[in-house]
Amino acid sequence: DMKNVDTRGLVLFSRHYREQDKLVKIFTERFGKRMFFVKNAGKSRFASSLQNFTQLELLGTINDDGLSFISDISEAKPYQFINSDIFAQAYASYLVGLSDVALPDNHYDAPLYGFLMKSLDLIEEKIDMVVVTFIFELQVMSRFGAQLDFGQCVFCHRKDLPMDFSYKFNGC
C-alpha cells in the first residue's frame, strides 16, 4: 500500500546502493523509521539534504511493504554543532542508534521521535551531552525490558522505610 505524504523526519543514516543510488533511513514523525530509495544520489538535488543528523520536511511516497521514495524536500536543517564536534557527534550517534533499535521499522512512535529530536536539540544547544544522554537512556530503557524501581524495596517490597538506590539491582 503506497501513499503520498508530507512529514517531518530525521536522517538516521545513508548507504550506497548499486553504483549511483543510495538508501537513506529516515525516522519520520508520522510513519516511523522508513528506508527511502534515492536514484542517482550524487547528482540528486536532495544530496546535501540527506546527510546524517539533518531534520527534513519532506514530501514522498510511503510504501508499507518496501522502499519509500522522496519527491521533494521543502526544508532541511542540519545540526551544525553536532556535525562539527566529534564528541557531540558520538553522543548523537548513540542516541540515534538507541532509537533505531528501540523501535521496529515502519512502526509509528511520535513520542520517541519527539524525545529524540528534543535531545538532539539540547546537544545542539551545547547543553551537557552526558546528562542529556543519561536522561534519554533512562526514558527508553523500559523499551528494552529494563526499568528502575524507586517505589519499593526490590528485596522485601516494603515502602515505609528510607531507601537507598542500588545500581546492581536496578532499584531501592
What residues fall within each predicted segment?
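Non-catalytic alpha-helical scaffolds and adjoining flexible linkers that form interface surfaces
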Residues: 1-172
